[in-house]
């Protein structure tokens, strides 16, 4: 399966039981910052933003004082899973990032999508990729 199909079919799809509700943007990005696939709405990010995210996975808490930045948008870092998931909040929306062996799975949402729904969509694909050795 092509990486774009994972983004289109598993991240940017309707959320189970909530037809018409879907993530605002999504992507799969390699640990080196190379974009494997992304939605048309995924923000253009800077290398230093990706470096900060990777540092936080290796040194949990790194982003807490400054916030998580992606495409110039600042998210307040909220509870995640050290080394596995980073979650951020901004107003009525937020971001979930799941780390796999080779990639980062990003989901960005706005209401009416909830943080829990975003977490479910992103982490389900991330867990699947981990099971596949990716």
UniProtKB/Swiss-Prot annotation:
The keyword Disulfide bond applies. A motif (Involved in PIP2 interaction) lies at residues 84-100. One of its GO terms (cellular component) is cell cortex. Phosphorylated by MAP kinases. The modification Phosphothreonine is found at residue 114. It comes from the Eukaryota. Signal peptide: none annotated. SMART domains: PROF. It is found in: Cytoplasm, Cytoskeleton. Disulfide bonds join 13-118. One of its GO terms (molecular function) is actin monomer binding. Gene3D superfamilies: Dynein light chain 2a, cytoplasmic (3.30.450.30). The keyword Transport does not apply. It holds the Pfam family Profilin. Keywords: Actin-binding, Allergen, Cytoplasm, Cytoskeleton, Disulfide bond, Phosphoprotein. PANTHER family: PROFILIN (PTHR11604), PROFILIN-5 (PTHR11604:SF25). Belongs to the profilin family. The variability of the residues taking part of IgE-binding epitopes might be responsible of the difference in cross-reactivity among olive pollen cultivars, and between distantly related pollen species, leading to a variable range of allergy reactions among atopic patients. This is Profilin-2. It comes from Olea europaea.
